[in-house]
Regions:
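Surface-exposed amphipathic alpha-helices with a cationic face
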Residues: 18-29, 62-69, 85-88, 118-122, ...
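Glycine-rich phosphate-binding active-site loops on the catalytic face of alpha/beta enzymes
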Residues: 56-64, 96-108, 136-172
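Catalytic cores of alpha/beta
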Residues: 35-50, 64, 79-91, 123-130, ...
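N-terminal active-site wall of soluble small-molecule enzyme domains
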Residues: 4-70
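Structural motif corresponding to alpha-helix initiation and N-cap regions
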Residues: 14, 38, 58-61, 80-81, ...
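Glycine/Thr-rich beta-alpha phosphate-binding loop at enzyme active sites
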Residues: 47-49, 54, 73-122, 161, ...
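A cross-domain feature marking catalytic cores of carbohydrate-active enzymes
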Residues: 7-9, 37-41, 56, 78, ...
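Long, low-complexity, intrinsically disordered polar/charged segments
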Residues: 1-14, 88, 92-99, 121, ...
Length: 177
């Protein structure tokens, strides 16, 4: 199965988001999988999530770290070497870098070159996770770029048989990382 869960909900009201977060947190706890929340620092604190992931247009990494403390996971989205180095300096535990391929789950992103991805991965000492447009057909193209892992949405949730999709993806991932 999966090794890390990030709850990313852009269209839910606060109460529905809270209920969903509690439900997913309990499921993650049952399977010993870290659970983080995207963008919503207050909700992450309220449900005692394992961490938070923020983008470049959200709260600054150092401010998030000050709120969540040293023991929670902090992930930061980056698209340049400069952003990556700053996020690491400000307390990020890992980076989400991309989009590495065209994606339908985020409207305002551009696709990074694989050379730039390699540069970002080489510039920092914390884990770097590839994000954006990754699927069974293109995952092998990430080999050798320096990523520590991948982040998936539609490659899992857009499939008719989610369990089968996860197993096939996990097999491919094991060849790369």
């Amino acid at each position: 199965g999966v090794t890390f869960v990030q709850l990313r909900e852009k269209n839910l009201d606060e109460e529905s988001f809270y209920r969903e977060a509690i439900e997913i947190k309990e499921l993650c706890k049952k399977f010993h999988v870290p659970f983080i929340i995207n963008d919503n620092v207050e909700l992450a604190k309220k449900v005692d999530a394992d961490g938070i992931h923020v983008g470049q247009n959200d709260m600054a990494a150092q401010d998030v770290r000050a709120i969540i403390g040293p023991d929670k996971i902090l992930g930061v989205s980056t698209q340049t070497v400069e952003e990556a180095l700053l996020a690491q300096k400000m307390g990020a535990d890992y980076l989400g870098v991309g989009a590495v391929f065209p994606t339908g789950s985020k409207d305002d992103c551009w696709v990074l070159s694989h050379d730039l991805c390699r540069e970002i991965c080489s510039a920092v000492t914390i884990p770097v996770v590839a994000i954006g447009g990754i699927n069974l057909g293109n995952i092998s193209k990430l080999s050798g770029l320096g990523f520590s892992g991948i982040s998936l949405i539609s490659a899992i949730f857009g499939q008719d048989d989610i369990k089968s999709a996860v197993m096939k993806l996990k097999e491919e991932v094991s060849k790369i990382f």
